[in-house]
Structures are given as C-alpha cells and as structure tokens.
Swiss-Prot record:
Annotated protein name in UniProt: Bis(5'-nucleosyl)-tetraphosphatase PrpE [asymmetrical]
Chain's role: Asymmetrically hydrolyzes Ap4p to yield AMP and ATP.
Similarity comment: Belongs to the PrpE family.
Broad class of enzyme this protein falls into: hydrolase
Catalytic activity entry: P(1),P(4)-bis(5'-guanosyl) tetraphosphate + H2O = GMP + GTP + 2 H(+)
InterPro entries in UniProt: Ap4A_hydrolase (IPR050126), Bis(5'-nucleosyl)-tetraP_PrpE (IPR023937), Calcineurin-like_PHP_ApaH (IPR004843), Metallo-depent_PP-like (IPR029052), MPP_PrpE-like (IPR041780)
Source species of the chain: Bacillus cereus (strain B4264)
Gene Ontology MF terms: bis(5'-nucleosyl)-tetraphosphatase (asymmetrical) activity; nickel cation binding; phosphatase activity
Lineage per the UniProt record: Bacteria, Bacillati, Bacillota, Bacilli, Bacillales
C-alpha cells in the first residue's frame, strides 16, 4: 500500500484541496480519490485557527469512518475539541475559539451532527497508526522507539504534545526536547505538531508540519517514495511560530 501523509491542516481546507490535487487526487465526487488507490493519512490537528475546521471534520470523518479509505491520528487540538464536545471544562483559546465560533453559528441539529461525527472519529481512531508491516508510524507529535506498541498515559502525552520538559517559552508555549535526534529505530516516524519552515528529516523521522495556518505551507509526504510535496498557505506569515527546535 502507498500512502500520502498530510501535515497539520488546522482548518485550512483550500490548502488541503490544493495539496491533494497536486498529489494526484480527484475531487469530482466531493472527496479526494486517487486513481492508483493511494491512501491518505493525517497526523492530526485538522481543526482550530484556520477558517474551515468543520469542513475538515466532515471530510476526514467521511474518508476515515464512513468509507474507511484513510487514516487519522489525533493531535492535541483534536483532544481538546473532543473534550469540549463531551462538555468538559476546557479553555476556549489557542485556536479552539475559531472552531467553536463556526460550531455555534450552526443551527442546533447541524451542531449535533458535527459533534457526533467528531466524537466518533476521535473515539474510533488509535493514538497512532503502525502501517506497512511496521515500516512507518503516523502520529501527531512523534513517538520514542521504546514507546511503540504502548498506549498508556505517558505515551499518550508524548504522542499528543511531544517530549515536553515542563518549562515554558516566553509566549507560554511548552519547551520540548528534540526527541528525533535520539531516535534509533528502523521504522519511519512521520509526525507534525511543531511548525518547521521545511520538512525536517532526522534519523528515520520526518516532521511535516510546515505551518500552513501560520502562513507557511501545507506538506504531504509520499510514502514509500519519501518525497515531500507542498502548497503555499493563503494566510499571513507569522514568523515567531517557526521557532528553532531546542
């Protein structure tokens, strides 16, 4: 099986459509379909900050749950939106406010449809996907070699948030260790979460979050070709979001 793994979309539907078309997908049915049966995989954070979060929920639900033709690994923003939809006490900030504004603008029956679709998508998707006979792992923020196969709380925190130190940057964002430098595994780890100006290949890992929602690019990785394809963002460039990885 061949896959096209898509970086953090964050509600940037137009960029997603542009990227999938560039990757050879046809949208005539209203969904991206590849003539060679390639499958899409998502590294999570499909919502928040961008203009079309609900559209992305509907598309990914359709591909992953209804048609079972794609793979989705949730990100930290997905986890927070899931908790919001469950009625938990979450702070509606750091991007969630844009998704909530879209959601609250809907009539109540459409709100229920979106909520049920996202809850189903989240609950029926694993923390990470092990694909191609364990040769590639698709996850949100990365995974250590010794965590592969585990799904406990410690691993969940790592996969959703990265290798956080507990410290904070001046803007309040968490300081993260560069776990990819220490990775010695044979499986490719394809992930996102931390915006980088260009896809970052370190050992057998590649970060494909190229900051689409911050004016960078939306990137897809063609696997097993290991070729990255990007399209430019239509949003304003926010330079401080592309911080060097410590």
């Amino acid at each position: 099986m061949k896959y096209d793994i898509i970086g953090d979309i964050h509600g940037c539907f137009q960029e997603f459509q542009n990227l999938t078309e560039k990757l050879g997908y046809n949208w005539s049915s209203g969904l991206p379909v590849h003539p060679d049966q390639r499958k899409l995989a998502f590294v999570g954070d499909i919502t928040d900050r961008g203009p079309h979060s609900l559209r992305m929920i509907e598309i990914v639900w359709e591909l992953v749950i209804h048609k079972k033709e794609a793979y989705y690994a949730p990100g930290n923003h997905c986890n927070k939106l899931y908790r919001f939809f469950l009625g938990r006490n979450v702070t509606v900030a750091h991007g969630l406010e844009t998704t909530v504004a879209e959601y609250e603008a809907l009539p109540s029956h459409k709100q229920n449809i979106i909520k049920e679709k996202f809850i189903t998508l989240y609950e029926q998707s694993p923390l990470y996907h092990i694909l191609d006979e364990k040769r590639v792992i698709v996850c949100h923020a990365g995974i250590r070699q010794d965590y592969i196969g585990r799904r406990d709380k410690k691993v969940q925190t790592f996969v959703l948030y990265g290798d956080i130190t507990g410290e904070k940057h001046a803007d309040g964002s968490p300081v993260r260790r560069d776990w990819a430098q220490e990775y010695k595994g044979q499986a490719w780890i394809v992930y996102g979460h931390t915006p980088v100006a260009e896809p970052r290949f370190i050992n057998q890992t590649v970060n494909i979050d190229t900051g689409a929602v911050f004016g960078g690019k939306l990137t897809g990785l063609r696997y097993p070709e290991m070729e990255t394809i990007s399209v430019p963002s239509s949003l304003p460039f926010v330079a401080e979001k592309f911080r060097p990885i410590s």
